[in-house]
Amino acid sequence: MPAPTIYVDADACPVKAEVEKVAERLGVVVTYVSNGGLRPSRDPMIRNVVVSKGADAADDWIVENAKSNDVVVTADIPLAARAVALGAHVLGPTGRPFTPETIGMAVAMRDLKQHLRETGESKGYNASFAPQDRSRFLGELDRILRRALKSATPG
């Protein structure tokens, strides 16, 4: 199995610096996928992919390129579900892992919240990103990447 790549749904991702920190320490390639606005990096281990402005263009690109054992970082639940189906390790920016066991409930909760917003039952409040989210993300990404690297090592 080849070494994992980290694919980041980069539009509005609050943990890019944390992704780079862990990836650099473990020697893993990072691919940021966005509709635009990415800063170029001099680091040869970081790739930027700019896709068209379509609603799911970045999501589609990630799903078309990610493979089993790669890592996908996203807050987008439908993308997380598609990546889990590929066999990728999926992590939200708050450090929440999405797995085959947890993705169904995440999709159901997303759909319920969307329905409540559409019917006016909810104002669409999302909790703000907190320092403990950043810390949890760092620890979880390190754990997931080490497991993916171990799976990629023959023997």
UniProtKB/Swiss-Prot annotation:
Where do the TM regions start and end?
Answer: none
What domain of life?
Bacteria
* A Pfam match: DUF188
Family matches, as InterPro entries: UPF0178
Q: Of which family is this protein a member?
A: Belongs to the UPF0178 family.
This protein is called what? Answer: UPF0178 protein mlr0875
Query: Species name for this entry?
Result: Mesorhizobium japonicum (strain LMG 29417 / CECT 9101 / MAFF 303099) (Mesorhizobium loti (strain MAFF 303099))
Instruction: Please name the taxonomic classification of the source.
Output: Bacteria, Pseudomonadati, Pseudomonadota, Alphaproteobacteria, Hyphomicrobiales
